[in-house]
Design a protein with these regions (language model features):
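Terminal RNA-binding accessory module
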Residues: 1-72, 87, 95, 276, ...
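Short, acidic/hydrophobic/Gly-rich beta-strand patch recurrent on exposed beta strands
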Residues: 16-21, 137-141, 309
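Rossmann-like S-adenosyl-L-methionine
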Residues: 6, 12, 173, 198-409
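A short, glycine/Asx- and small/polar-enriched loop/turn
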Residues: 120-124, 187-189, 398-399
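Short, solvent-exposed loop/turn elements at beta->coil junctions and helix N-caps
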Residues: 112-119, 180-184, 230-231, 389-393
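Carbohydrate-binding surface patches
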Residues: 183-200
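Extended interfacial segments that mediate partner engagement and assembly in macromolecular machines
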Residues: 54-69, 73-178
Length: 409
């Protein structure tokens, strides 16, 4: 008889974790804490194993029926924990963050309950892959080279699903060479489509796609953009006002604004203080800091986002275009710092610069518990963790956001 495994936790990435009889941890997707399962296709490594869900002997009370047909029928890899109840998802994310801080960051802290927003229909954008066989969709879980044709996404906003339906109808007019397509519902009501390809489409190709979209999309014709392999972008229709192809925006912008405000509140009074705003994006946090009386030095590497930020002239703000690693040595000594890095975290160069600069407080907005914990460990000799808050911007997935306040020892 196949060995049965009791699932005890959810790991980073969303796999369930249990222990085999030989003591090895085994990671099994689509399982829940409390499940008793028989794994299949077990692949043994020196200290752990991976497998699939073969037989579910006992179902956890945390299990629910997935809402999306693609989740089970097509093994969609876009969501990892749709089979968990909302409370179980939030607890899993709380533990993922707490365990990362303890094991990687060497920080003993009780992470409070995860704060969450809408569970469904929240994403303002999705990116689909265009397959050689005409499939337009997402990758299967554990099979990054296998696509399935996506008809609907339960975590995407209604406008995004309307765009998906329109693009499916217009798929014969998608310009040749397109490898991916991003569908986005802009904050100011500008629906947009980004075509990812080595070269921009011709005017004839763009016109044909726009004409087909006009017939299939109920609103105004979506803005159309091209995005190249080296970050190049180009507007493919006139008078476009959206954020564009390159500009990053949270999938829940209003929730992102709230997290940003929480991070700035952690700095307490910033009036007449110098604050670094690193990875500043479009400058929303910079503007809030300036409104609170701070002198701000902000750094952003994306030219498009930098240009958007510069539209607002603020006398107490100095803006720097470039990577934080390249620019941080040019900044004045700060009183406080806000960092909001990508999933790769700060990196050694930036943590060293922060340690040398010696700000009183660092508000760290993180989208990856592991790199957050790594950076906290690097800053540990000089900074201690004062506050941790966790947020679920991506229900049904294993992603967890957090804000951590670090204070100089």
């Amino acid at each position: 008889m196949t060995e049965a495994v009791r699932i005890t936790d959810i790991a980073t990435g969303g796999d369930g974790v249990g222990r085999m009889a030989d003591g090895r941890a085994i990671f099994i997707p689509r399982t829940a804490p409390g499940d008793l399962v028989e794994p299949t296709g077990v692949r043994l490594h020196s200290s752990f194993a991976k497998g699939g869900l073969g037989l579910l002997r006992e179902a956890s009370a945390a299990r629910v029926a997935p809402r999306c047909n693609h989740y089970e029928a097509d093994a969609c890899g876009g969501c990892q924990i749709q089979h968990l109840s909302a409370p179980a998802q939030r607890e899993a994310k709380r533990r993922i963050l707490e365990q990362a801080l303890m094991r990687i960051g060497d920080v003993q802290v009780d992470v409070p309950a995860v704060e969450s927003g809408p569970e469904w229909g929240y994403r303002n954008r999705i990116t689909l892959t265009l397959g050689p066989n005409g499939a337009l969709g997402f990758h299967k879980v554990g099979q990054p080279d296998v696509l399935f044709d996506a008809r609907h996404c339960e975590i995407a906003r209604p406008v995004v699903n309307q765009l998906l339906a329109a693009v499916r109808l217009a798929r014969t007019t998608i310009p040749s060479g397109t490898t991916r397509i991003t569908l986005r519902d802009g904050r100011r009501g500008h629906a947009g489509i980004v075509l990812w390809a080595d070269q921009p489409p011709s005017g004839t190709e763009s016109d044909a796609l726009r004409a087909a979209l006009r017939d299939g999309f109920p609103g105004d014709v979506p803005e159309l953009w091209w995005r190249g392999p080296r970050g190049e972008s180009k507007a493919l229709s006139a008078n476009q006002e959206g954020i564009g192809a390159v500009g990053f925006e949270q999938v829940q912008p209003d929730f992102g604004d709230r997290i940003r405000s929480i991070a700035l509140d952690m700095l307490e009074s910033v009036a007449d203080r110098l604050v670094w705003d690193l990875y500043a994006g479009r400058g929303e946090g910079t503007a809030l800091l300036a409104a609170r009386g701070a002198r701000v030095e902000s750094v952003e590497r994306e030219p498009e986002l930098f240009a958007l930020a510069q539209r607002e002239t603020l006398p107490t703000v100095r803006r720097f275009l470039g990577s934080v690693e390249e620019v941080v040595g040019q900044l004045s000594p700060p009183d406080s710092v806000v960092v909001n890095p990508p999933r790769t975290g700060l990196g050694a160069t930036v943590t060293e610069a922060l340690g040398s600069a010696g700000p009183e407080r660092i508000a760290y907005v993180s989208c990856d518990p592991a790199t957050l914990a790594r950076d906290i460990r690097r800053l540990g000799p000089q900074y201690g963790v004062e506050t941790v808050r966790a947020f679920d911007l991506f229900p049904q997935t294993a992603h967890v956001e957090s804000v951590v306040l670090l204070a100089r020892r």
